[in-house]
Design a protein with these regions (language model features):
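Hydrophobic transmembrane alpha-helices and their immediate loop junctions
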Residues: 1-149
Length: 149
């Protein structure tokens, strides 16, 4: 029978706990940044934006139609997958940096307030500017695909 959680190396120092806590949001940031060229490559190679049945909803979400008669519009699904990838990583990173309870933001703020505010603003600025319409994942991906392909 397993003994459960066993402390082997003593208490974790606040600094190391902060490093571990900030790793989650930074992973979301990394996935967001890596996702941009990956999705531009995928959408550019497949020509998904050349397909005319994907109307743009002004907030950046595509108001997608996945079925057209008897055919499945995989291009719309592919575009939405890229959009959701970018949205999800930004929103999850911001949510995780909320300095409350078990979320990583509380641990990061306990370790270093300057690190907390830096990472929090890295997520907050793009999310707020996205909701006010200054940019959208759809426009970002479409613009880069049109520029490169």
């Amino acid at each position: 029978m397993a003994p459960g959680a066993v402390m082997v190396s003593g208490l974790v120092k606040r600094r190391y706990n902060g490093y571990v806590a900030v790793a989650g949001p930074l992973t979301n940031l990394t996935l967001f940044i890596i996702g941009i060229p990956v999705w531009v490559l995928i959408l550019g190679i497949t020509g998904a934006f050349d397909f005319s049945h994907t109307p743009l909803f002004e907030t950046g979400l595509s108001l997608s139609v996945y079925l057209d008669g008897n055919s499945i519009l995989w291009q719309s699904m592919l575009i939405d997958a890229g959009i959701v990838w970018l949205y999800a990583n930004l929103i999850l990173g911001l949510f995780n940096m909320i300095p409350w309870g078990p979320l990583d933001g509380a641990k990061v703020k306990d370790w270093s307030e300057s690190a907390f505010y830096t990472v929090f603003l890295i997520f907050l600025i793009p999310v707020i500017s996205m909701f006010f319409g200054f940019w959208s994942p759809y426009n970002l991906l479409e613009g880069l695909v049109n520029l490169i392909f």
